[in-house]
Amino acid sequence: MQDDALADLAARGIALARVAIGAGATLAPGLVSRLQFGTTTPAQTVAVRMLGARDLALGIGALLATRHGPSGLRGWVEAGAFADAVDALAFLRAGHSASRRRGLTVLVAGASAAVSAWAARRLDA
């Protein structure tokens, strides 16, 4: 499989995952908060719902942009990469204790940021 086809597949796959995660966080922020942080507070519920809406918008935007070809998709993939990189850094800097939840979030968000950045560079090549 050529790099451009693999980049397109990766971008679409991440967009679909972003829609699923975003929908879950938007519709069930208490559950996602418990899974993510181990607790649920009103502030966490609001933050999770807001981040869920962000991911839902980025994922839907990317999927809709596929109608315009790779050049239309690239900006959405770059925006998603940026959001995931910020999420990874925020969780990395959150607190001094290492937890499995925190480590998993940093790993998943960091990997998504890296793959998205790679795909974005190849989408319009």
Descriptions of predicted regions:
Residues 1-125:
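Short amphipathic, positively biased membrane-proximal segments
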